[in-house]
From Swiss-Prot:
Entry-linked InterPro entries: FabA_FabZ, FabZ, HotDog_dom_sf
Function: Involved in unsaturated fatty acids biosynthesis. Catalyzes the dehydration of short chain beta-hydroxyacyl-ACPs and long chain saturated and unsaturated beta-hydroxyacyl-ACPs.
Enzyme class: lyase
Coiled-coil stretches noted in the UniProt entry, renumbered to this chain: none
Name used for this protein in its record: 3-hydroxyacyl-[acyl-carrier-protein] dehydratase FabZ
A molecular-function term among this protein's GO annotations: (3R)-hydroxyacyl-[acyl-carrier-protein] dehydratase activity
Superkingdom field: Bacteria
UniProt xrefs under Pfam families: FabA
């Protein structure tokens, strides 16, 4: 279990772009389960869409990538303060299945598929109340800053 203070040790992101509120399960080298609470106060809703707020798919992808980054950093025993950064390197097989709206709790799940020379591949999904909202295969690269 990781609260937002510990999450901030493993992700360089800050408001309004820190998209993981809590980690509820993490098995180093294997998987992570985290969540993001979606509130009407999200900056993105000022433009997407003011009269019918929908959390953008690209933000769901970013949230899955951030959860994957935490898993990668914890697995490697590194933190951004050590001079490492985890970069979003690619995304494949993206599917959006359900809108995510204010009041939803977006559960983020990521599983390590492979790692080779600092390039990590993750199978990710985001759900709301057990219903699939999005899925993707995400590539991240561990690089020195």
């Amino acid at each position: 279990m990781m609260d937002v203070n510990e999450i901030r040790e493993y992700l360089p992101h800050r408001y309004p772009f820190l998209l993981v509120d809590r980690v509820v399960e993490l098995v180093e080298g294997e998987s992570i389960i985290a969540y993001k609470n979606i509130t009407v106060n999200e900056e993105v809703f000022n433009g997407h869409f003011p009269q019918n707020p929908v959390f953008p798919g690209v933000m769901i992808l970013e949230a899955m990538a951030q959860a994957s980054g935490i898993l990668g950093f914890k697995t490697m025993g590194k933190k951004p303060e050590d001079g490492s950064i985890y970069l979003f390197a690619g995304v494949d097989d993206v599917r959006f299945k359900r809108q995510v709206v204010p009041g939803d709790r977006l559960q983020l799940e990521s599983r390590v598929i492979s790692e080779k020379r600092g390039i990590w591949k993750f199978e990710c999904k985001a759900t709301v109340d057990g219903v699939l909202a999005a899925s993707a295969t995400i590539l991240c690269a561990d690089r020195k800053v």
